[in-house]
């Protein structure tokens, strides 16, 4: 039996003991997108699909793999700034798209600037963003918003962190370690996700 066949058999066996969370079907042998991840349907059940495990920012990606905003370009603002004949005050600091600049001799075209590639679909010329910067998911931020209760003095896991419940009996008030947890690898109860789990999270 080939390696792929063995891998699929192991995956199928593992899922047989697990309740189906997402019963949607997919065409066997087809490839599909799930947010920023690429998936392969091998048994017709979408929840069993083999998927990459990138952490997809849902402020950027739709579930079907399309982007909510245009893909960042490779345009360099410095090239356009060289054509800029606007005046500036020597010594003044200013933003030009995503770059930081310092005026040298009174002309913006001669300013000294960082050379990052700026996406004009994201940044305005004055350095402000056209839409809010996506917030990185953080297990600690989520825990502190939790309305769940816990037994005072009890130890528990919250994603990859170890916690001790305080006298208040609230998960949000517990004392926890502060590791950065990948929610595509960890479940809220501290157990690890199977590597084949569909990246749509069901906690």
UniProtKB/Swiss-Prot annotation:
Residues 129-150 are annotated as: Disordered. Pfam families: Pacifastin_I. Expressed by the venom gland. Its main location: secreted. Residues 23-59, 85-121, 147-184 form the Pacifastin domain. Residues 1-19 form the signal peptide. Disulfide bonds join 26-41, 36-56, 39-51, 88-103, 98-118, 101-113, 150-165, 160-181, 163-176. The keyword DNA repair does not apply. It comes from the Eukaryota. SUPFAM superfamilies: PMP inhibitors. This is Pacifastin-like protease inhibitor cvp4. The lineage of its organism: Eukaryota, Metazoa, Ecdysozoa, Arthropoda, Hexapoda.
């Amino acid at each position: 039996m080939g390696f792929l066949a063995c891998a699929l058999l192991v995956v199928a066996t593992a899922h047989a003991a697990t309740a189906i969370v997402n019963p949607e079907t997919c065409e066997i042998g087809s490839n599909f997108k799930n947010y920023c991840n690429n998936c392969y349907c091998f048994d017709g059940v979408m929840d069993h699909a083999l998927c990459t495990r990138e952490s997809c920012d849902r402020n950027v990606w739709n579930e079907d793999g399309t982007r909510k905003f245009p893909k960042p370009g490779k345009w360099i603002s410095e090239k356009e700034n060289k054509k800029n004949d606007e005046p500036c005050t020597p010594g003044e600091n200013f933003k030009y798209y995503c770059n930081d600049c310092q005026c040298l001799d009174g002309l913006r075209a001669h300013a000294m600037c960082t050379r990052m590639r700026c996406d004009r679909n994201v940044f305005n010329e004055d350095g402000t963003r056209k839409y809010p910067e996506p917030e990185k998911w953080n297990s600690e931020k989520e825990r502190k918003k939790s309305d769940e209760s816990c037994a005072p003095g009890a130890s528990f896991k919250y994603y990859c962190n170890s916690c001790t419940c305080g006298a208040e009996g609230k998960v949000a008030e517990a004392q926890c370690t502060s590791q950065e947890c990948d929610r595509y690898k960890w479940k809220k109860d501290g157990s690890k996700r199977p590597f084949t789990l569909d990246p749509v999270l069901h906690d």
